[in-house]
A protein has these predicted regions:
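Histidine/acidic-residue-rich catalytic or RNA/ligand-binding cores of hydrolases
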Residues: 12-18, 71-76, 118-128, 195
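Alpha-helix N-cap and loop-to-helix initiation/capping positions
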Residues: 40-41, 81-92
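Hydrophobic faces of well-ordered beta-strands that scaffold small-molecule active sites
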Residues: 1-5, 61-63, 110-111
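Active-site beta-loop-alpha junctions enriched in small/polar residues
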Residues: 6-10, 66-68, 112-116
Length: 198
């Protein structure tokens, strides 16, 4: 069973944002980045994720990350400590994954992050990016762009996958092949079958 979460992000007005505003970067945005540079936030996320794993008997945990964090980190950094929030955030992310792997040795951590945005050497030691790019999610899927992105990528991350939302287009479908492949049967280019609204 796979659990798909985006634990580093919160919405304004949610229980977490109201109860712990000090755990959020003070950037007025639709999405708020959690202060993973703080140990108490890492501990909170660890306990929350563990509760889901234990309750739902999770075997694969997908951690997504669909936001641009740089401005949040820069807003929080002190003038003479530029970059420290980012460094601490990433170090605590690694520690979070290490703690999860120590507690659940057979847990698969799928590092989604908009597909392939966290494929540094340290992340690859702890997690696998099964979903290699969110470019597949675009209505105007460009098979050539996907092939260009994948040139050389499969040597570094051979077990990754994609989806093709244009069934019947052999070239687009084959451009999306990988060890993991998802077919989207409901979203096509046919005018008699519009894209789903959700």
């Amino acid at each position: 069973f796979l659990l798909w979460m985006e634990p580093e992000r919160a919405y304004p007005g949610t229980d977490l944002a109201v109860a712990h505003p000090e755990w959020l970067h003070p950037l007025d945005d639709f999405y708020l980045l959690l202060r993973l540079d703080k140990d108490e936030v890492r501990e909170y996320l660890f306990n929350m994720i563990c509760s889901f794993i234990d309750t739902l008997d999770i075997k694969c945990f997908r951690q997504d990350f669909n936001m641009e964090p740089l401005q949040s980190w820069r807003t929080t950094d002190e003038l003479d400590r530029a970059g420290i929030c980012e460094i601490k955030h990433i170090m605590n992310l690694y520690r979070l994954w290490d703690d999860l792997r120590a507690k659940y040795p057979d847990l698969i951590i799928d590092n989604c992050a908009s597909g392939g945005r966290r494929i540094d050497a340290e992340s690859l030691q702890r997690a696998i990016p099964i979903w290699r790019t969110d470019a597949f999610c675009e209505a105007n899927l460009d098979p050539d762009a996907i092939q260009a992105q994948m040139f050389g990528y499969n040597r570094l991350v051979p077990c990754s996958g994609g989806v093709c939302k244009r069934m019947g287009d052999t070239y687009a479908t084959r451009s999306s092949y990988a060890p993991c492949y998802v077919g989207s049967w409901w979203w096509t280019d046919r005018p008699d079958r519009p894209a789903p609204t959700e």
